[in-house]
Amino acid sequence: SSFLQRGFDQVIHDIAIGGFPVRLLIDRAGIVGEDGETHQGVYDPAFLSQVGMPLYAPSNYAELTYWLHELLKDGCRGPRAIRYPRGGENARLAQYGCSGQDYDFLHRTEGAQAVLISYADEMDDILTACEKLTEHRINCDALKLVKLFPFTEKMIEAVKDYKIVLFAEECVEWGSIGEHLAYCL
């Protein structure tokens, strides 16, 4: 991710403007502390959404495999990017497999007025937060995004009626996926 930042002008001029069918696989997405301050993968969601590039963030190997195959099909035109964190698969998130959908509710409670939203490995923390809130009789749902940008109308419809929408991500604030969602809501 941090090396992609250094080539952002090429992403704009050599890929996005021409709409070329390039697939970017972005390793070390999110916070990667031990790699050093200048190697954090917290900018790519913001800058790739600025050029209108569809962006995906699988939460497990099954989703990564599925979306790699989907985005390599002939009918999938234009540039696309898949970002994934450093390290191995999160065991908890691996249990959810792959639905092939742009988003999934991983936790639902009847009468929930709040939804906690995230993507990739951060969903593990979201699920833990939902469990703790449920222990305190606070009903909430957990929504996992796989396709981060652009949002589908169906996803916006799924969250627009919640009284409270909380978004967590390892990304800079300005231009983040959470900021895009706030704008849409």
Language-model features: locations:
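Thiamine diphosphate
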Residues: L4-F8, I17-Q50, K73-L185
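Conserved, well-ordered active-site substructure
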Residues: D14
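Short, well-structured alpha-helical patches and their helix-loop capping segments
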Residues: Q40, Y56-S59
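Conserved glycine-bearing catalytic or ligand-binding loops at nucleotide- and phosphate-handling centers
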Residues: P58-G75
